[in-house]
Each structure stands twice: as C-alpha cells, then as structure tokens.
Amino acid sequence: LDNIKEGCKLLKEHLDNFNEIYLPVDPDCDGYTSAALFYNYLVDVLHYPIEKIIYHIPEGKEHGLSTIMNWFPEDGTNRLIVAIDSSSNDYEEHRSLSNRGYDILVVDHHEASKYSENATVINNQLSEKYMNKMASGVGVIYKFFECWESMYNGQSAQNYLDLVALGEISDVMQMTTSENRYICDYGLNHINNKFLRNLIKKQCYSLFGITEDKFNNNYYTNGSITQIGIAFYITPLINALIRVGNPLEKERLFQAFITPDILVPSTKRGEKGMEETICT
C-alpha cells in the first residue's frame, strides 16, 4: 500500500510526543469497526492515554470532514487527525486543516482522483501495486497495523480480525480475494470483541437455532458463525441504530465496541437511578 510506512512513522511521531489524536467516526458499520480497531489498538496494545484520543460521532449520515471542520480546535499544532473509511478526496479540507497546523492521516478504501497534497493518504484504490481492491476501511486499517508491527514489532493485529470480518461483511465486500476470505474465515472463528460476542449471544436463536441457556463460548471459535449469519442478523442491528438512533444511542454503540465495561445509567424497567455495564 502506498504511503503506509510514512503513515506509521507519522503516527509514531505523534504517539511518542503524547499528542492529541482526533478520530472522526464514519457513520456505518465499516466506519465504526475501523475506528474501534484503531482506538482499541492504541489503548490496549500501545497503552496510549484515552484522554488523548478524541473521537466524533456524527448525528446523521454525513461522511468526510466538510461538516465537522468546526469540531477541530482552531490551533492544530502538535495534533493529528486520523480519518478512517473516508476523506480521501477532501482536498480543500486537508489544505485548510494543514494551514491550521494539523497533520492528517487518511486510511481509506473509497475511490479518489488523486493523492492529497496536504495529507498522508493510504488507500487501496490508489495503490497500483496492492491487488486487493475489495478491502474495506477496516481492512485497510488492519493492513496499517500489520505494517506497524513489521516496523516496530508486535503480534496483536490479528486479535482484531473479528472486527475486520464484521466491517468487511457489512460493507458487502467481495470475498473472491484470498485476503478477504482469510480475514473472514479467521475473524469469524476468533470472536474477541466483547460487544460482538454479546450481540452473537443475544442473536443465538436466529444464528444457530438455540436459546441462550443452550449457548456456550464454543460458538465463538468452532466455525458456527457464518458470513450470511453476520450479514442477516448482526449487521442490520448496528446499521439500524446508526441510521435512526439518537446521538446518545450512537455514542453508546461506539462505546460498546471500545469500552464495554464502563458503567452507564440503566434503561431497564424498575432500575431508574441504577447503573449497569454497557455490555450487560
């Protein structure tokens, strides 16, 4: 992938200086899983302080940077924007933000006419030597961390292949490429994300024809979870909330992917004023 090593070096420079990272979340399942993979890798693997990662959940279906320019602080000095699954062709926004002092890293899979002159763009569609044009945004950010681990050592990226599989299936990526096939086969047999595990358990009757009392953890690793099952019984739940949920519900959805054990006010009948973990 073009610019991938430069992108890793750019991120490392900002992490080494404990700079603020601004993370716009694209409003679809691929966008949520992409941002969640990035956030979780930084926090869980690299132990980056959570207060240094500032994310933005859009209220509607707006994509890219044009509608959130005022969300970024005016002074971008020593700050990095990481735009995943969007923004390859936001050339004017890149120029404006660069003039304000920001460094910009774009990790994307959408078509674009050219590389931005004011951002480091990693895009499989623009990379002539990278053959997998069917990777979605979460697939490209996974390849980013594969490269990161080859440069700075590590073996943790594959632990997030469940999120990659979910995002690629939800974005209806073709599975005729060997890379996508491997990602989905491995990811669906290694379900590690707690929120995704909970969703699968709650949908076990639709997925496996069993009730929750018959469900056990073997289903996360024994090949029972299929691409069709994810596409029909998991993805629609996530997409529906992203489309029609209120801002708090969308925030809770992303939090479930990244911080499943935080306490939030209970919404259960008879538990007003009480708290529960976000992934109960």
Language model region names:
Residues 37, 115-170:
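Short alpha-helices
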Residues 70, 97-98, 117-122:
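Short low-complexity, flexible loop/linker segments enriched in glycine and/or proline
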